[in-house]
Amino acid sequence: MRFTRYTTPFFSLLLSGCVVGPNYAPPEMPLPAKFSEGGVTSNGDVTVVAWWTAFNDPMLTSYVEQGISQNLDVQQAIERIDLAAANVTIAEASALPDLTLSGSHTVSGQKGKLRKQTYTSNTSTGELSLSWLLDFGVYKRNTESAEAALDAAYASVDMAKLAFINDIISSYVDARYYQRRLALSQANLKSRRETFELTKSKFAAGAVARMDVVRAEGLVQSTLAEIPSLDANFRISAHRIATLLGKPAGSMVEEIAKGSNQPAFRADVNVGIPADIIRNRPDIRKAERDLADSTAQIGVAEAKLFPSITLSGSISPSGGINERGVYGNLTPWSFGPKLKLPILDGGGLRADVDSAKSKATVSYLKWKSRVLNAIEQVENALVAMQREGRTVRALKREVEIAQETLRLSTSSYKDGASSLLDLLEAQRSLSVTQASLARAVQEWAKLYAVLNIAIGSGYNPVAKAGL
């Protein structure tokens, strides 16, 4: 065993500096200094910003906070972290010596009529085996690969959180939009029924023609026809919210129906600069970790082109007591290195290297594409949100004008100074404008969420040890 004591450090020293394959360096690419309609100041770490509180809607805030931990997609992503962590342990353990210990004890004997005497014997054996594979970096690169995959798993959790936040807010905004449309339709229905009754009274008095009564009733029926689909869409949105929170689809309809007005945010968004999204967006971080994983696999493939040495040895002491009570023992041992050298493989190992390099190139291109797409998403959301804000402000004024027009038309019709067509047109104009405003408020709120998601804001990452 003295030979083992001296040769193992020798081979370790021989191969410790022989790790093949490229050493990983994070990718870089030129980025614009600012977004086209943004500032030049970094927004820092926006991952912990609870930007949805700008809607000032306690119900929405509670749903987001509940779902970050309850959403099933998030829970699945968290569970995959355990798998990735186990793979790191496996990769690290593979680089260490394999030491096994075994032992046995046997009692044997003979008896019977054919034997003149009966006896038993006791035999004990044990074995201690050591095996250690030394190579050109397979285990080191495998460990690097597993660690990168673990980091990617953490990034996937953050991606799942952002996807949930976007889905829950979008579904909530939709539910409130349909709820608002229902309220508008019911108010319009009341107004049009009043007009219908007034027109019937005028017809009975001979002040208007039968055609006016038919037109007024037709408007009532068209309003009634809107309500069922609006109610169905509200319920569908409520079902989606419940599912996102890990609850049965129909369990939250009544709770959500008690909610308030359409969400309207009351805050500006500091989008920062393009360089910020590389740090803050988990999908970009995952793409970078995938690239690190692919780069490490090049080293794994290249290491298989070189020799590997396995150091192995064993000690197997055994002893026993025979039928006469005499004890004897034997201690065989063995040690020796084994060299494995690939010579002819038909080009398979070289092809593995080429394949690994190609996969790394694809990973880099995916990372670059992620960055460019992220910049585009921020630019698009920023422009769309700002323009939609102008639309909302204009529609609010248009609704005020339509309401005043309807008030004047109603008064004029009652006095007989204007026709029913003027009144019906005023009602229709107000209904259309109110619906347009509700749609614009819905879209504006969604764009606010889209912009915050695009800059990687709000997933509030937990320390790795806490997941």
UniProtKB/Swiss-Prot annotation:
Main subcellular location: membrane
Keyword check for NADP: no
Superkingdom to which the source organism belongs: Bacteria
Lipid moiety-binding residues (N-palmitoyl cysteine): C18
Record's signal peptide: 1-17
Gene3D superfamilies, A to Z: Outer membrane efflux proteins (OEP)
This protein's GO CC annotations: plasma membrane
Keyword field contains Nucleotide-binding: no
GO MF term set: efflux transmembrane transporter activity
InterPro entries on file: OMF, OMP_efflux, RND_efflux_OM_lipoprot_NodT
Keywords: Cell membrane, Lipoprotein, Membrane, Nodulation, Palmitate, Plasmid, Signal, Transmembrane, Transmembrane beta strand
Intracellular or extracellular location(s): Cell membrane
Pfam families in alphabetical order: OEP
Membrane topology value: Lipid-anchor
Chain residues carrying a lipid of type S-diacylglycerol cysteine: C18
Membership in a protein family: Belongs to the outer membrane factor (OMF) (TC 1.B.17) family.
Protein name: Nodulation protein T
